[in-house]
Amino acid sequence: MPNTPAAVRQGITVATAAPEVSAAEKKRCHELLEAVGQVLWVDDEALMDPVTALSGSGPAYVFLLVEAMAAAGAKLGLTPEMAMQLARATVSGSGELLKQSSEPAAQLRVNVTSPGGTTAEALKVLMAADGIQPVFDKALAAASRRSKELAG
């Protein structure tokens, strides 16, 4: 299951192979898939449903995040164009920082959060019991269920 960032060679593809596929065939497949980004392999084909939910559909979640950030910025008085430019650059730059850093995402989040500051205040809302984590839990579970249904 590839994802759409493959269009700019920044994708990630998760693949599985039947036991009868030779090591040479698997290697060739890996080389072809690497042309559009990272490649991971799973032995258990049942994992393809959660993979689809997380990374196959994941770009849409990021794009929705950008839309939501830009809309919130516009509601605070920024022009829609400026709000979108800020949201796009923030998500793109944060993604690149995450990619280049050896620190986990949680530590990068802590690094940008000053105690009692603006980020801390926003994170209180986003990390509340009814915040972003339960929404993602439900969304990915729904996508995984739908992937199973579509697979028959």
What are these regions (language model features)?
Residues 1, 16, 113:
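Short beta-strand segments
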Residues 5-6, 101:
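Alpha/beta catalytic cores of group-transfer enzymes, especially the acyltransferase/condensing modules
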Residues 12-50, 61-101, 146:
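Internal alpha-helical scaffold of NAD(P)-dependent oxidoreductase catalytic cores
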Residues 49-60, 109:
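A short glycine-threonine-serine/GTX helix/turn-capping micro-motif
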